[in-house]
Amino acid sequence: MKKTLSLLVTLLLCLTLLAGCAAPEGSDKAEKKNETAEKTSEEVKEAAEKGSEKSSEASEQSSDQAKEATEKSSDEAKETTEKEQTIKVGASVTPHAEILQACVEPLKKQGIKLEIVEFTDYVLPNEACQSGDIDANYFQHVPYLENYNKEKNSDLVSLGKVHYEPMGLYGGRLKSIDDLKEGATIGLPNDSSNQARALLILQKLGWIDFAGKAGLETTLLDIKENPHKLKFQELAAEQLPRSLDDLDYAVINGNVALSAGISVRKDALYIESADSEAAQTFANVIAAKKENAENPALKALMDVLHSKEIADFIEQKYDGAVVPIS
């Protein structure tokens, strides 16, 4: 019994010792776990900080790149704007502004922007050109331009011819030149310049002749020979198409015929030729101040206006009422 009791006491002491030894070991493990956790936390934190720094650096780099791209784009746009030259040209609506519109794209390819300013009268385009509000205009022929310069003491010059609007003979009660009969009545424009052109057409046909050399100042009073005893009725140019039923023939301006729905190509019995004195004299021109005559952009405009592309455009669109000339 005593021996048994001694064994039990010894066993208890051993168990106590074992328990004491186990506790520090568990504590060490716990401490090690804590240390590992702390180390892992620090590593995660450090990695997060590094990631944040890299993200911030990338963001700053991206922002710098975007700023640089924006500045580059702005510089390129500025450079393009500086390279592109703008010219303003005044014009009457038909056919002048329409012809200029066909020049916009060809000029754009050369770095020239063409702005078209439309006018509805024949005074303002020259005034705007003289004052510098526009660089050039397109609506008039040289005699009109010269008269304006004389009256206004201005220095506008022609940069070149573009087109003419041929005057032609049209049938009224008589539908063919061969139908001409004695005493036929022919309608003529009542303004001096257009009437002279009309009389030159009749001379070309052999219907009348003049005492001296005929020119663009010829009048009815200059007629010397009238073998068919023709009668002449003077009317405002725009009234002639409406009066065809009351006339045997009428001599009508190309633009007036166009406005009246008359086909110059199909309906005219005879028209002025491009090399005639009238066509060359009354061809419509581009005009500008003398100091702008050598403007490269205006020279480029003239080159485009004289190109085959624009000549084809004019011939197709206006059915003979407007004819390209250079």
Please report, for each region that a protein language model flagged, where it lies by residue.
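Short, polar/charged alpha-helical segment
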Residues: 86, 93-118
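A conserved helix-loop-strand patch within extracytoplasmic ligand-binding domains
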Residues: 81, 159-208, 311
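Sec-dependent N-terminal signal peptides of Gram-positive bacterial secreted proteins and lipoproteins
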Residues: 1-26
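Short helix-initiation/N-cap motifs at beta->coil->alpha
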Residues: 116-127, 215-242
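A bilobed periplasmic-binding-protein/Venus flytrap-type ligand-binding module shared by bacterial periplasmic
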Residues: 166-177, 282-295
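Bacterial lipoprotein signal-peptidase II cleavage site
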Residues: 18-34, 38, 42, 46-49
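Immediate post-signal peptide segment of exported/extracytoplasmic ligand-binding proteins
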Residues: 26-33, 49, 67-88, 107-109, ...
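Ligand-binding "clamshell"
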Residues: 147-159, 173-174, 246, 251, ...
